Amino acid sequence: MLAKRIIPCLDVRDGQVVKGVQFRNHEIIGDIVPLAQHYAQEGADELVFYDITASSDGRTVDKSWVERIAQVIDIPFCVAGGIKTIEDAEKLFAFGADKISINSPALADPTLISRLADRFGVQAIVVGIDSWFEQETGKYWVNQYTGDETRTRQTHWQLLDWVKEVQQCGAGEIVLNMMNQDGLRNGYDLAQLKLVRGVCRVPLIASGGAGKMVHFRDAFIEAKVDGALAASVFHKQIIEIGELKSYLVKSAIEIRSE
């Protein structure tokens, strides 16, 4: 069994790390490079960087900080934000990214997933999915352009259909960003994760809702996810990564040791 991964997420806007609640009202957390170094030293297994307004602004991720990150950390990192072409991806890999993640551009053109996977290998291509639970209908919908709350829109895709589609197109990993839970710190949506796990053959990463160490444990044990991504609990120093890993080991969860 592969070891479970702990993944701090750094949302980037205008060159700084920010964090919102349910993808809204973002506050500045700090500078990118020192935070990346801090999490790498704390024992993170990998890092994810989202240039959150790149897609909605019609641009690609700001590459200047990608190269700086690659120079100062020695753990894998994934970069997302407005990647629409093979050339966009090539530049990010050249600057040192280990993986790229696509979200809104994949919804606009699902063949992008296949083209990227064919060129760089499925192991390097992550698809991010921003899901919203609609209380009235009990359905999970996929949203697009969520980095800018004024442009966020619901797509015609229901969650499980899109999960199946991106796998057929060549996604090597899926990060499920559960928007209803984002930033609330009251736990991952285990019911949603279990539904997705049932149709997901590739590594599945939970995102949105971590507030306590037990939330990570529950996602790994109950929903059988491969990794857990979190932001505010790490940014606000509510949970320290080393302590979290020790806790998970005591819960009989296989974790990558330092």
From Swiss-Prot:
Recorded GO MF terms: imidazoleglycerol-phosphate synthase activity; lyase activity
InterPro entries with a match to the protein in the record: Aldolase_TIM, His_biosynth, HisF, IGPS_HisA/HisF, RibuloseP-bd_barrel
Active site positions, chain numbering: D11, D130
Pathway of action: Amino-acid biosynthesis; L-histidine biosynthesis; L-histidine from 5-phospho-alpha-D-ribose 1-diphosphate: step 5/9
Leading EC class: lyase
Top-level taxon of origin: Bacteria
Reactions that this protein is recorded to catalyse: 5-[(5-phospho-1-deoxy-D-ribulos-1-ylimino)methylamino]-1-(5-phospho-beta-D-ribosyl)imidazole-4-carboxamide + L-glutamine = D-erythro-1-(imidazol-4-yl)glycerol 3-phosphate + 5-amino-1-(5-phospho-beta-D-ribosyl)imidazole-4-carboxamide + L-glutamate + H(+)
Pfam families: His_biosynth (PF00977)
Biological function: IGPS catalyzes the conversion of PRFAR and glutamine to IGP, AICAR and glutamate. The HisF subunit catalyzes the cyclization activity that produces IGP and AICAR from PRFAR using the ammonia provided by the HisH subunit.
Name of the protein in question: Imidazole glycerol phosphate synthase subunit HisF
